[in-house]
């Protein structure tokens, strides 16, 4: 099976997506037929496999290429010899952050009936907004940390609104999990943390920062009527991972398996199933969990994890191919114009 990797985007995580695509190339190798780069101005470019390295993008050489136009079933390439349609194999949406994870590209691909692996519109909207994610989890019976939601109108009253003690964590509601995130240990650090978070989002979440919490990551997808899970990862424990630590090191090919009980692993999987539901059909997602006093809490849903979290799967290629056979179908609407014909008949 062949794939097309779509990456880049007008996003704060633009570089993350490039690194993610380069890493996935090393995993899937000759199964990737096309690499399609989306720049910050929303132009599409076809990138040769030989140019899929960081130096090429650091020098912005793709600007010398002719831009492509997304259309039904593929991309339109104009040249002196006329227009040509590049028919796309199954697309992997690997655009992190805005454009890729907020639903814009999902809408565009669905509109042009281009088959793709990735979250659909509704799943993107719910998972990209951390506040909506909490509401979604609560509705499904999945625990999440307490929080306060701030906007520009009430940020001046932040300390009055926060109902928990220092330290707490300040994060943008709409952004990657490490962008604009700060741990606030005392009052004088709050202004900087809020300024940083509001750079990335119009709304900001504040959560209690709990020392010594256990963290576990689990990726997976739905195959037909069952689930395919990765193994559980326990991330390296630091106060929190910054942007570079979390995203720009894709050199690892495997992550260490977590040492946890079978009972806890089953709890994580059951919570994952609830969150995946039917909403995330067609996507490989990663759910990041906290375990606090033997209770499982959702930290976040990553609808397009870096390099699709391939390093967490024992057989990623088979998982991807099985998912490709389990994509949700969009029913085609048959337009018959019967009402219009009846109007004409009655005239």
Swiss-Prot record:
Gene3D superfamilies documented for this protein: 3.40.50.20, ATP-grasp fold, A domain, ATP-grasp fold, B domain
PROSITE patterns according to UniProt: ATP_GRASP (PS50975), DALA_DALA_LIGASE_1 (PS00843), DALA_DALA_LIGASE_2 (PS00844)
EC numbers, comma separated: 6.3.2.4
Cofactor: Mg(2+); Mn(2+)
Binding site for Mg(2+) 1: 288, 300
Enzyme class, first EC level, given as a word: ligase
Ranges annotated as spanning the membrane: none
GO BP annotations, alphabetical order: cell wall organization; peptidoglycan biosynthetic process; regulation of cell shape
HAMAP family named in the record: Dala_Dala_lig
Name of the featured protein: D-alanine--D-alanine ligase
Annotated source species: Helicobacter pylori (strain J99 / ATCC 700824)
Gene encoding the protein: ddl
